[in-house]
């Protein structure tokens, strides 16, 4: 009986290690999908300078209003990665506000795939929650 209790309460070390490893493709990029309202974004993150592109344009050109660019930069700013990572993304559906929210959600999820230790900070800020 003691062996049965011990087996039930034992955690496999492989399960723990797997959740702390980054999920990167062959090119060293982390990928995630973000959603808000009816907008859907696909986001890739890799090491590089502060460059955020949306549908092939710099984010400042795609979003004319500064508030939208600020919204999608929030996860990078919160995790001190604003000047360290490049973000490539596509977004479709909905309006500009929904698209900015979908990008923030996608960037947050990609950051967790890139560095799983950031999950707690992003979750606390509410960036990983889909609405």
Predicted regions and their residues:
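Structured, basic alpha/beta domains of bacterial-type, RNA-associated proteins
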Residues: 19-35, 41-92, 97, 101-131
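Intrinsically disordered, compositionally biased charged tails
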Residues: 1-27
């Amino acid at each position: 009986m003691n062996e049965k209790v011990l087996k039930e309460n034992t955690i496999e070390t492989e399960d723990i290690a797997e959740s702390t490893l980054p999920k990167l493709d062959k090119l060293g990029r982390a990928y995630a999908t973000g959603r808000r309202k009816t907008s859907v974004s696909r986001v890739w993150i890799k090491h590089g300078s502060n460059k955020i592109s949306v549908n092939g344009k710099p984010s400042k050109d795609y979003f004319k209003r500064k508030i939208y660019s600020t919204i999608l930069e929030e996860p990078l700013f919160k995790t001190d990665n604003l000047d360290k990572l490049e973000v490539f993304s596509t977004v479709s559906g909905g309006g500009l506000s929904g698209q900015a929210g979908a990008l923030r959600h996608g960037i947050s999820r990609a950051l967790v795939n890139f560095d799983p230790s950031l999950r707690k900070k992003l979750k606390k800020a509410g960036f990983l929650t889909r609405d």
